Amino acid sequence: MVHATSPLLLLLLLSLALVAPGLSARKCSLTGEWDNNLGSNMTIGAVNDNGEFNGTYITAVADNPGNIKLSPLLGIQHKRACQPTFGFTVHWNFSESTSVFVGQCFIDRSGKEVLKTKWLQRLAVDDISDDWKATRVGYNNFTRQRTVEE
């Protein structure tokens, strides 16, 4: 049964239809400073016309935390999407290992940018028989660092 509230419901649906495109049109940007759920920090520079970027990464987690150093990263993203997919490699300056991250830049329901990533880390091993233990897999969620004004 349809009651007198139908015009109100129709008005609400029409309002949502008009407002929703504006909400999804905001583009998520990789450029800037990010923190992850483990306390690591990443800075991504400007993304060029080909979608390429570079930056730096400082991890909060390591097998030998006393040796942690700022490490370079190099990546690429799809430029057309409002919530682009991307990938980057980190060349760890303090260990014989390399990590690759893949993910997507999202704008969450509260309007904040979030990077959802999965990663592989390859450790150097001395013998092929140790290959089985040389690759780690995980995930990180990054949020944009707050600025002083926030």
UniProtKB/Swiss-Prot annotation:
Role description: Forms a strong non-covalent specific complex with biotin.
Residues holding biotin: 36, 40, 57, 59, 63, 95, 99, 140
PTM comment: Glycosylated.
GO terms of molecular function: biotin binding
Residues of this chain annotated as glycosylated in UniProt: 41, 54, 93, 141
Subcellular localization(s) per the UniProt record: Secreted
Record's protein name: Avidin-related protein 7
Keywords, sorted A to Z: Biotin, Disulfide bond, Glycoprotein, Secreted, Signal
Annotated Gene Ontology cellular component terms: extracellular region
Domain Avidin-like: start-end pairs: 26-147
Gene encoding the protein: AVR7
Leader sequence residues: 1-24
Pfam families according to UniProt: Avidin
Gene3D superfamilies in alphabetical order: Avidin-like (2.40.128.30)
S-S pairs: 28-105
Quaternary structure and interacting proteins, as annotated: Homotetramer.
Family the UniProt entry places it in: Belongs to the avidin/streptavidin family.
